[in-house]
Amino acid sequence: LEQGLRAVKTPYTLLLDADIELAPGIVSALYQKARQENLALVSLMAEPPMLNFIERLLMPAFIFFFKLLYPFALANKPVSRIAAAAGGCILVETQALRLAGAFSSLQDALIDDCTLAAHIKRAGLRTYLGLSRAARSHRGYPGLKPIWEMVARTAFTQLRYSITLLLICTLIMIAMFLAAPF
């Protein structure tokens, strides 16, 4: 990635996971948002595929859990210390990426996208994270194991491997589910 970044001559760099499909016009929309709102990093959490029962059952809960751990509204506030990004789709100012230490600063990060957002915010720059159907993931989760591994990598890491915090978050999710109007 560092070798590729050295060849970048554009003011913005688009970082995409290989399984992400973007709707027509979304890159220009991200660019416009970045320019109009003076954002150094714009990130979209891609819509998961929802092709099988386990995905339809667990992926909405994972997205909800991710938003509990990384509240988008707080992450998007310049004064907030909370930083978050979804690595599937990130448009970042090339200079900001370099200022943040580029990819070498992420080599030991367990959650590289959120770490990148944190580096950029610490540099005094603004970030944005949103949900969108304009970025769609084609990465399938055929069973419980790959979903559990993803949750363990993201959520459990953010909770500092605390079973107590995991149980609290789980109880909050259950309470919100039970309190939801159906």
Regions found by a protein language model. Name each.
Residues 34, 41-66, 98, 103-166:
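Catalytic donor/gating beta->alpha subdomain of glycosyltransferases that bind UDP-sugars
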Residues 18-33:
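Acidic donor-binding/catalytic loop of UDP-sugar-dependent glycosyltransferases
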Residues 1-8, 29:
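Glycine-rich, basic loop-to-helix element that forms the pyrophosphate-binding segment
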Residues 158-182:
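Alpha-helical bilayer-embedded segments of polytopic membrane proteins, i.e.
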Residues 13:
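Short aromatic/hydrophobic "clamp" motif used to bind/position activated sugar donors
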Residues 4, 10, 18-20, 112:
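Short acidic donor-binding/metal-coordinating loop in glycosyltransferase active sites
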